[in-house]
Amino acid sequence: MAAEKTIQYPIFTVRWLSVHALAVPTVFFLGAISAMQFIQR
């Protein structure tokens, strides 16, 4: 986005961490739930 990488760097890291912290467990939980459903049936 911006060429300045002095104060924007921590914001990008925080946003990256928040996005991954929300996306990774969601995908993992969806996969686990779907696998459990298929195994039970």
From Swiss-Prot:
Q: Which InterPro entries match?
A: PSII_cyt_b559_bsu (IPR006241), PSII_cyt_b559_CS (IPR006216), PSII_cyt_b559_N (IPR013081)
Topological type in the membrane: Single-pass membrane protein
Compartment(s) of residence: Plastid, Chloroplast thylakoid membrane
Q: Which GO terms describe its cellular component?
A: chloroplast thylakoid membrane; photosystem II reaction center
| Needed co-factor(s) | heme b
Q: How is the cofactor bound?
A: With its partner (PsbE) binds heme. PSII binds additional chlorophylls, carotenoids and specific lipids.
- Which positions bind heme? 20
Q: Which GO terms describe its biological process?
A: photosynthetic electron transport chain
Tell me the keywords, alphabetical order: Chloroplast, Electron transport, Heme, Iron, Membrane, Metal-binding, Photosynthesis, Photosystem II, Plastid, Thylakoid, Transmembrane, Transmembrane helix, Transport
**Which GO MF terms are attached to this record?**
electron transfer activity; heme binding; iron ion binding
Q: Which residues cross the membrane?
A: 16-32
Spell out the subunit comment: Heterodimer of an alpha subunit and a beta subunit. PSII is composed of 1 copy each of membrane proteins PsbA, PsbB, PsbC, PsbD, PsbE, PsbF, PsbH, PsbI, PsbJ, PsbK, PsbL, PsbM, PsbT, PsbX, PsbY, PsbZ, Psb30/Ycf12, at least 3 peripheral proteins of the oxygen-evolving complex and a large number of cofactors. It forms dimeric complexes.
Role of this protein: This b-type cytochrome is tightly associated with the reaction center of photosystem II (PSII). PSII is a light-driven water:plastoquinone oxidoreductase that uses light energy to abstract electrons from H(2)O, generating O(2) and a proton gradient subsequently used for ATP formation. It consists of a core antenna complex that captures photons, and an electron transfer chain that converts photonic excitation into a charge separation.
Family under the similarity heading: Belongs to the PsbE/PsbF family.
Database matches in HAMAP family: PSII_PsbF (MF_00643)
What is this protein called in UniProt?
Cytochrome b559 subunit beta
Q: What is the lineage of its organism?
A: Eukaryota, Viridiplantae, Streptophyta, Mesostigmatophyceae, Mesostigmatales
